[in-house]
Amino acid sequence: MASLNTPECPVMSSRPSMSCGNSSSSGLAIQGHSQRPSQTDPSAVEQAAQDSVIDLTNSDYETCDANRATKRQKLDLRIDVPNTQRAPKARFSQAVSSPFALQDTVPPIRTGRPFWDFGEEVSGFGFQGSLESEIPNDEPEQPDSLPPLPVRPWRYRPQGHSSREETPRVNQNAGAEVQTTPFCIEVPEAAPIFDSGKPLDFYPWKGDHPEDSLTDQTAKQGYYDRVQVSQNESNTARPSLYVQLKHRSGLKLLSSVFTAAIDKRQSHCRVTGFSTFKPPPRVTLTDIKRETWLRDLANPSVPLRRLSRTIPHGIRGRILLDQCVNKAIPIGRAVWLVKCVGANEIRAFKRKGTSAAITHSLEVKWVRDWSINVHQFIESVVTACGTPNWASTMSYVIRFAARLFQEQLLDQALCLDWFLQSLRTAPIGTLPIWLSMLGAYWTSLVRYRKRGRPLAESLLEKLKTILSLEDSGPKKQIADRLSWLIKTFAESHPACFVLPLTWRTYKSTLTTCFCLHLSEDNRKIGALSNRNERIVKAEICRQSGRQSPSQQVICLLDSADSLNDMEILSSGCLNLHFDHGSLIMKILEWVSTSFRRGSARVYVAVRLLRKWRRAGMDTDNCIVNFLQQKADTPGFSPANIYHLVCELVRSQSFAVGKYLQWLMARGAVRNDAPMHPTVQLLAHLPRRKLPSHVWNLRNTLLTKAGFLLSSENQQILNTKRYIHHRLPEVITKPIAGDNEGLFTPSDLSNLNWTIKSEIGHWIREHVSLHRKRYLRTAPNHHNACAIEISALTPAQFFEIRDIIECLGDLSLLADILKHTSSSDNIIVLISAVDTLNYCADSFKAIGALSDLFKSALAGYAHVNKADVSIIELISSLLEVGMKLPGEIPVVAMLRRDLSHFDKKFTGAVSSPVSDHTGESVNIASPAFSEGLHQLLNSGSGMDEPNMNKIFDMLSRKLKQSKEPNASSHEIARHLSQLRVLNSDVFDRLMVKWIISTLKSSPRPHLLTFLPPLIGVGCVTFEAFFALIDRLLKSDSHRQSIQDVSGLRYEMINLLRKEIFYELGSIDLVSYRFKTTREEYITHHAYDALGLVNEALANVNPESTSNPPLVPLLCELIIQNLNAFGPEGAGRIVEEFPNCVDIIHQALDVLLGLKAQVGVQKTQSVVGLIDDLSLSYCLVKLRLLLDANPDGDAARSSIVDLLFRTAESDIRNGERRWLEVLNVLPVSAAHLIRQRAEREILSLSLISSSLTTFSSEEDALIYLCIVEELSYSIPDEFSPSSMGADLGDKMFLLLQKTVELANAKKGTDLESGASSTALGVAELSIGVWFFVLLRLVALHRSLVPPNCDSRTEINHQTRLLVQICCISRSPLFARRSTQSFISSISTFTKCDSLLRMLPSSWANLQLQALDVCSTLVDTLSDEARYECARFLRDKCPAFLHPQNDARLLFLFGPIIESQSITTHGSSRASTSTPVTNLTQHVQSTPPPSQNTLTPGMVEEPNLFTNKLRFQQNGRITGPYPPKPWEMLGDAAPIIGINDTPVNLAYFGTRQSKRL
């Protein structure tokens, strides 16, 4: 038995293989002649044997088992034949593609087999050359002048040449024994012998032979026994043979003659007679005798001749296996015992009176039960892992089971299915055992797809499970071995890894088995991935694999890192494949869109344009062209463009004179209302740094356009008076005029940038004058220079900051913050740092954040550290520092300082002073605030009772406040300082107080007490909303809270931006609340939207008593969609259903939609889609599709609009339609896909014009839509007409293919027009075949596995047969080496369509076979055999599965026995799936004449597969020999060996018998 641990087996251990001994049991024996060995020369014998050896043992039944259980043959040991080395067999020299080599490629020998025809095997042998060249001359040499004597015909053995050297004579009679017996005539040793055993031409004289009688004729002519021929045959036998062959029985007669000749040749060429051996009978023995017999069987020295007389009864099934394992019976002898037992069991079924059908069914049942016993026995041994001697037992069982399977002593199909199921369900601990058994079944498993694909999936699943476990030594070894096995499997049988259902599950696992850094491995995994991607459906929400340059620019600008380093951002934009003009236009579009928040993008664009203008780009022209093109675009906000131009003019980076010349040259300045943005820009140019003549020209053009310059001057004066009214100490110079008609702060933001710029510079000048006027100096402890101290008070700073922020001129605010950072007032410093925190993004874009932060740190270094407010300053600095990547050391230093001051102010002191701390503060005292401030700054600490007293006093005072004011803000600051002393106690007190306040009646408005607490940090938005959510989910708390819906609206009201104007002046606390609210909207917009959704659950959002939510929803939607991207459209609609109506309103505001309904609004939304508004348009489209106000008609019109949009985008090479459809409901994608499928099936197959491919291009466009929306195809089976429609379309294509092939045979190809027309038709067929293949692959769920619907199965089998016929047509045979894309590229220039096509016709044919694989996987065995039989019986030879290895791999072998027994039913059923198909297929000529021998078999290399049943002179099916009867016969003599010897070891040659 060959060891399973061969080097080729990828799952075996590295033990050295056992040596294999070859033995023969062919039943041949050598009868030697009586020639004396001394008369021959050994070298001559060896040379002759090597020259003319005919190996009679070269059969297909040699075995690798040294313990081959066969009988001994008769051997003549007197033959002295040199032990020459056996020549290799050329027929088995091909390389085995399997990674396993568990046995020789030669199948095992079967002894005692029935006789069959050896004609094909023996026909290859024969003597070449003349007989004289083969037989050496044994006569002495003659002189050169004389001719050689003729060779005697009976001289077969070579004779030794006489030596020319004289040897001394030896007296041979010396010492000779005198013969005392009478003389007896002996037959000459060299005489030829008849088959009957009599010598040729040897008749000793006895007197009764005709030669012994002397006659006149014998005396004259001699005696001879030659038969006298009546006449010479001078004529040919052809006429007489023709007469016989023309007769109706001539062929039968000729067949009989040939059969008789073959039988004679077989009988004369046999060395021994026919075997009469029968399986040994079973007898009942005692237990002792049975054990003795079994021990003798386990002993190799006991010959089987003695044991084969009888075998013990009762050894069967599980008992037989146990005995073989327990007694370690050699594998060969154990197999012999199994055969004997099986032969007796099967022979018992063949009783008299039992029909052949019942006998066959009983035999099949017995073999199946025996196989189940073997499987259960193996499983029991596997589960006994860890027991003593388990390793040796397991090794024996594996080898024994493998030998039984190879000897075909098990049910092959049942055994393979059992192994696959066991491997699939095996735990990781026993996986190496099953992998070691895999080699025995490897060839049978991977031969056909039926079991090759499940094997690939099982191995990939095991590897995926192992890789998910924690790393360990054994796990890594198993994973490496399994990876190598899978890689080898995928390389040798890639078709088994075409996984239409599980490819995306195992793709990453399979990729890990290959080394992607190697080009060869990368190519293999890429090819396998491409094959699978052609037959799988698209993933839902699949984004385009490559972004357009404009999308890449938007991503760069939206990224958070874009503000940190402008050099990186600039180089990133310039490195894109985008021309400079389009790049600047895209940046201006990003700046001016209403779908982005914040003013930082203006300063980002300003710095980029300054940099690029210095590099030579024409930025001015791009800005003017942008204003001209985007004037009427929805979502366009020109205010940001005006701000951008203002900043560029300030830095002298915009040519105002050139712009004015452009206006005059174009005649754009007209008195129109409204004013065009290109002209409106004149009203936003800053006056400073412009020459007087340019400014005068600007005024002239504005006057011509109808703009009142006096109104502009009056607005400047009014604004200055308003600011002077708010800052009388800073702006000391009075402004002429009264204070009547002053406008609100909101009016400041509506001013044009000419006024804003003028006012901003004016404020900055007065702040500088105020600083110089009240400048103080202080000693610097770090160096000798004095420190200049700013004299701005907190109130003054609050007013200046509020005015500048209303103006939106943050670059001027940065200059003012530079002056403020030198103040010694800690409140001013905290406010300045809070301003940095709120406007951090804008200051980053300006490039001033880092310098301002360093200035604030310098102010922190000189501020009074004894004030408890120092903690607030450090906290504010920390928030700013964490937004600067380069300030990590400073952040660490600030954290240490914060920890230090926390410990300083939280030190608890247990003393009489601390016991009376709470009593020393009286809330009714006018000096309450000052006393509390002194108490908190004392640093003496505070215990819990005193903290409770002070907290109660502060909370009562805060609750009494009717509205937020300076008093409530001061109380909130005291509470934050109180929290510093003991944060844990304070937080518990705060939670209790908030709960009690919410339950109080009447409940105070949240705006009265919550904004100050949030501003100082005692409460956060997240914590407060979470607390409310927990209270409302608790039944006990919910019942005690009144007006829950009103409470929710108050919570939403806290997030409204307009609240800051309602809170009054913006001081330290209010500004911090503003900052906190902005951070919550930015980072928790999703939670805020959920809060709105809960508030709108039971309340009408249009109620007049509720605050307006549209501006807040606009802000939340912008923030959410920018964070989530296009996929967030579906998320918002699905998770916030209560906000649908108000989201509609907010999107109408953002998109600028007017009062449109239905299809008109949908068309407007689709027209607004661009890179910036995509997410918002998607949400709007989904809402419109879900709303469906007009029923099915409106939905159908929307679907029709989206379908046309998709078609147009594909023609233009865009993929934006895919992003639109991926976020819409699956129902919408389903409708659009069905529309595309109907369009494909309605197109004609062949274009009317020979030079255009309109129908083919349309088909590819519609196919692209179907592919991208294929995720809408249900995986579950649903009855539809798609299968029948695809079958009809494929049949028409097959018909066109056959007609084209016939036309090409009868057409003069030398004609240019005909050749061109046929070429166009072939290309059209190729395109349509690809389109239909993709549709079939995408709709693979048309027939589910194990479907009982005969109609659906017929649709699938019909498609399967049609695809096979088209793919094997001559069209693909002729064009197999030609490129497909280069031929098709003549009718379309769309790269997206060309990329989806296969590269060559060979790849298209391969894709067709892969699609067939998807269909075959869901078919039952009966349906698969039906398709294969149809291709074999009704189609040309080139379509026979046995003639094409790829078709044979798909369909598997045809079960001939079923086709014989159910001939009538199968013939009736095969006509169903292929109606009207035969006449078209049979007319197709074969692409080649190289066909294989008919017959589909499981083992193509087995010699027994050539045996056939014959009935009435016709082959009706194969004749498989029964493996249970393949036993060797008993040896007639007793010898030293117990098995026959392979004659090939001795280099013997065939000797002809007469």
Swiss-Prot record:
Keywords: Activator, Nucleus, Repressor, Transcription, Transcription regulation. Residues 32-42 have a biased composition (Polar residues). It is found in: Nucleus. GO terms for molecular function: transcription coregulator activity. Coiled coil: none annotated. Belongs to the Mediator complex subunit 12 family. Component of the SRB8-11 complex, which itself associates with the Mediator complex. This is Mediator of RNA polymerase II transcription subunit 12. It comes from Coccidioides immitis (strain RS) (Valley fever fungus). The gene is SRB8.
